[in-house]
Amino acid sequence: MSPSIYRANPSSEGYTYTKKDGLVTGLNTYGVIQPERKIRHGEENKVWDAIVIGAGYAGLVAARDLVKAGKKTLLVEARDRIGGRTWSAEVDGTTYEMGGTWVSHNHGRLFSEMQRYGLKDDVSVTRTEGGGCDYFTLDTGSGSRKLTHKEAGDMTANAWNIFINWDGKMGRDICPLPHSTLGNIRVNPEKVKEVDKLTCRDRIEQIKHLLSADELALLESIVPHIGGGAVEDMGFLGMICAQALQNYEIATFEEVWTLYKIREGQSALARRIFDDAVRLGLQYTFKSPVKSITDKDGIVSVETTASKTYRARRVVNTLPITCLPDIRFDPPLSPLRQEAIKINQLDYLTKCHAEVEGDLRGLRGCTWPGDLLYVYGDGFCAGGKSTRITSFAGDNRGKLDPIKEPEKLETALQRFHPMKIKKVLWHDWVSDPYAKAGAAWYPANFLTKYLAELQSRHGNVLMANADWASGWRGFIEGAMEQGAIAADTVLNEVGNVGANPAPGEYQRSSRI
């Protein structure tokens, strides 16, 4: 498929800041669907086989799999676009990933979707070897220094390996099966609970005497870069899981986490899944926030804030943990799940992009402490005369509000390297009412107590979100895992018509 088959329509989401125009709301994306509602006449009040709430990757995969099996399915989405916390904006010919971004062959479900829709080779890379400003800047508060990428990489690797080596085997003993972290045949659950008691700060305090000042600064910044929260609260067990998922090697961190992107943007893949589902019969309604879910007498009623009610035999709810308190469930959620939701998650990240003049494609950098922690030169913008810059921070609540003080993003970016900034772009996930945060990272003592409950069903409502995936929690891969599993469950219960006759329909042969 060519990107020209899609038109980038305006979304109400996303922000652009320039000194000339100030703050402007709304960005164009392939993820905006027109018309915004498609429900066949006379079918609005019927009982659907399934309703899928949320059009992120979990919801898209679930909806596609359900309609592909012939199930009458309605997709209900609060936003004006598909993608949830993963979407790409098209600005002046350049694609900007506003949320989830990178892909890897380690992400099996995601890669299979890329293969399915002809995108397996349609990738670009964030890092440009030999690009302009081909070095790493490190600013730990006493001025910026230039390091080679190898020097910075070696320091980061040494710090990470000391930090993560809790079991003396780089995580292999405590997490041999990262998709079954909390219960498998090789690890005593009590040992896992012991690790889950640790915050990342606890672990840093245990090993910081083994690190140089620069190594400590790099570790203090990469931890919130990974999890989006404060090291004082972030659970260390999640870091062990991340280590296992990247094959127990810091050497693969870039390849798995921050290197390969879909050339056309994540919204191009999301759009392919959505279009496939619509071709197969999916019906949908956008700008339809849900306010209540009622499960009674085998039928689930979903009511929107506009007082529209839709009914189905099963519901796949893909809302993130941060948004579950906004929904009234009847019957109420279990006390244990409510307890987990009250504690909630920690990823209050800031992610922004900038278009800067000249060639900064080779730039990498870290500032600690800083309003932004990491920066990546991210290829040329359209036209080849300016560079796309991507930057991340952890929990900046109370310190940096990019909507109220967007000029502070420019100031923070200048700490990495002198830049002539043409524009800054971002999605403010913390103020987004349908996200309220980034992809989940949990505090200590959370996963071993609450993960299984978050994954469990609530009557005829299946809960499916990357926030409680078994493997790649918080990743696109985890969202696809959850959506596919939920769809399979619905099909097994609502009925999946296969190629073989139902039991009892075989005719016995007169001769054997």
Residue ranges of model-derived segments:
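Conserved flavin/dinucleotide-binding core of flavoenzymes
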Residues: 2-36, 299, 365-512
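Mobile amphipathic helical/loop "lid" adjacent to a hydrophobic cofactor/ligand pocket
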Residues: 2-5, 11-18, 125-234
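Core beta-strand elements of the Rossmann-like FAD/NAD(P) dinucleotide-binding domain
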Residues: 46-48, 305-314
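Glycine-rich FAD pyrophosphate-binding loop
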Residues: 67-91
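Active-site/ligand-binding neighborhood in enzyme catalytic cores
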Residues: 180-289, 318, 328
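A conserved short coil-to-beta-strand element within the FAD-binding core of flavoproteins
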Residues: 286-300
